[in-house]
Curated annotation (Swiss-Prot):
UniProt family annotation: Belongs to the TRAFAC class TrmE-Era-EngA-EngB-Septin-like GTPase superfamily. TrmE GTPase family.
One of the GO BP terms on file: tRNA wobble uridine modification
Stated role: Exhibits a very high intrinsic GTPase hydrolysis rate. Involved in the addition of a carboxymethylaminomethyl (cmnm) group at the wobble position (U34) of certain tRNAs, forming tRNA-cmnm(5)s(2)U34.
Presence of keyword GTP-binding: yes
Species assigned in the record: Xanthomonas oryzae pv. oryzae (strain MAFF 311018)
GO terms assigned for molecular function: GTP binding; GTPase activity; metal ion binding
Protein name in the entry: tRNA modification GTPase MnmE
Main location: cytoplasm
Co-factor binding details: Binds 1 potassium ion per subunit.
Compartments, record wording: Cytoplasm
Gene3D superfamilies: P-loop containing nucleotide triphosphate hydrolases, Probable tRNA modification gtpase trme, domain 1, tRNA modification GTPase MnmE domain 2
Keyword Hydrolase (UniProt): yes
GO cellular component: cytosol
Binding site for GTP: 226-231, 245-251, 270-273
Length: 446
């Protein structure tokens, strides 16, 4: 049966035992199944006490039944929620009875998928449901809540609306090719392109911040041996996670440690020191360090403050591929008062704690930009959103270039591709396989 004609059922409450458990039904048979379970009367948006019974009339459980009639429900279909005791055994028995009465087990994310397909929320909002549930702290939860409320989607739609107006002018210029572009609203096209680029740049910046709030930041500690990378990881983590000795090359493998820092998760990766030579085990450690850099959002380049230039030479070009870098001069407590400090680096001492507060501030700035906790526009975002915005930005830039050469057909195509990239975010333009991947990552009852 298709999703539009079948009735689905699943446990909607959290896994495990609890005070209350919820079984959710959605589809045309929801109300009928509830009646057959033993709910004598159902009024929309009213709570009704009932005993839920099996095929022989024995009581499975007792609790509350609520009916949300279409289209005034989460999915846009008839929805019934059966609230009973939070026993996994009883909840599974209740689901099995619903299936006997004509429902089928819901797929992962199918309730949210139906809400999307029925126009109750767009794709970015549907994804935000999972982000609200998975939020690791209050700031991430608030950002996810704003995305669910449509803050992100409305900004995407604003850019899309600007592109629509642009496309109208460019398509008109193509239809009237004998007329100069300026007589067909050339200034409006140029102004519109400027506005679109500005809106996209701002939205991309905020989406990258939202992705950091959702996914955290992957930061790799890199540098020569005995620069104090492991000591710095321990200082940032607030515990002795890495082995620290005075022997160069102590760290041979990678060590991952996740910490909470000002509203986002920072995953620190301690790595083997980079240098020429070393035994086979140390060389393997250095290979793994370089591999970690390829996946890094941020490189924390740790150098010995007493001789940073020599330490910098040992690293070579290993960090060139990492877009964001923070240079740290460790062991600053061992410097004489007259020793000069690099103004582009942060001086710290993992032993005394000197400079760690400044390091925290700089890490936050690199992760979240100049965003302030609690600003109205902060929202959660995902990697696919950021990638789609980057594609849209590239296509708008290309359209601007083509218009400069008066290549109107090519400019129109670039604007169409930019529009399409934005549509992928909200689901206005999405391939079926993309939708399947997104909703299959949800909980069964969501």
């Amino acid at each position: 049966m298709s999703s539009s004609t079948s009735t689905i059922v699943a446990i909607a409450s959290a896994a495990g035992t609890g005070g209350v458990g919820i079984v959710r039904l959605s589809g045309p048979q929801s109300r009928q199944i509830a009646v057959q379970l033993g709910v004598a009367r159902l009024q929309p948006r009213h709570a009704h006490y009932a005993r839920f019974r099996d095929a022989q009339g024995a009581v499975i459980d007792d609790g509350i039944a609520l009916w949300f009639n279409a289209p005034h429900s989460f999915t846009g279909e008839d929805v019934v929620e059966l609230q009973g005791h939070g026993s996994p055994v009883l909840l599974r028995q209740l689901v099995a009875r619903c299936i006997e009465l004509g429902a089928r087990q819901a797929r992962a994310g199918e309730f949210s998928e139906r809400a999307f397909l029925n126009g109750k929320l767009d794709l970015a909002q549907a994804e935000a449901i999972a982000d609200v549930i998975a939020a690791g702290d209050l700031r991430a939860a608030r950002a996810a809540r704003r995305a669910l409320d449509g803050v992100f989607s409305r900004r995407v739609d604003a850019v899309a609306h600007t592109l629509t107006r642009l496309r109208i002018h460019v398509e008109a210029a193509i239809d009237f090719a004998d007329e100069p572009l300026d007589t067909l609203g050339g200034n409006q096209v140029r102004d519109g392109l400027t506005q679109a680029r500005t809106l996209l740049a701002q939205l991309l910046r905020d989406a990258e911040r939202g992705r950091t709030l959702r996914d955290g930041l992957h930061a790799v500690l890199i540098g020569p041996p005995n620069a104090g990378k492991s000591s710095l990881l321990n200082a940032l983590a607030g515990s002795e996670r890495a082995i620290v000795t005075d022997v160069a090359g102590t760290t041979r493998d990678t060590l991952h440690e996740a910490i909470q820092l000002d509203g986002f998760e920072l995953t620190l990766v301690d790595t083997a020191g980079l240098r020429d030579g070393g035994d086979a085990i140390e060389r393997e450690g250095m290979r793994r360090a370089r591999a970690e850099l390829e996946r890094a959002d941020l490189a924390l380049v740790v150098l010995d403050a007493r001789d940073p230039q020599a330490a910098r030479a040992a690293i070579g070009d290993a960090i060139d591929a990492v877009p964001r870098q923070l240079w740290i001069h460790n062991k600053c407590d061992l410097l004489s008062d007259a020793a000069p400090l690099d103004v582009n680096a942060i001086a710290v001492s993992a032993v005394t704690g000197q400079g760690l507060e400044q390091l925290h501030i700089r890490l936050r700035e690199l992760a979240l930009g100049d965003g302030v906790e609690g600003v109205d526009g902060e929202f959660s975002a995902r990697t696919r959103h950021v990638e789609a915005l980057r594609r849209a930005e590239r296509h708008v830039d290309a359209a601007d270039l083509e218009l400069g050469f008066e290549q109107l057909e090519l400019a129109a195509e670039e604007l169409r591709l930019a529009h399409e990239a934005l549509g992928e975010i909200t689901g206005k333009i999405s391939a079926d396989d993309l939708l399947g991947k997104i909703f299959s990552s949800f909980c069964i009852g969501k």
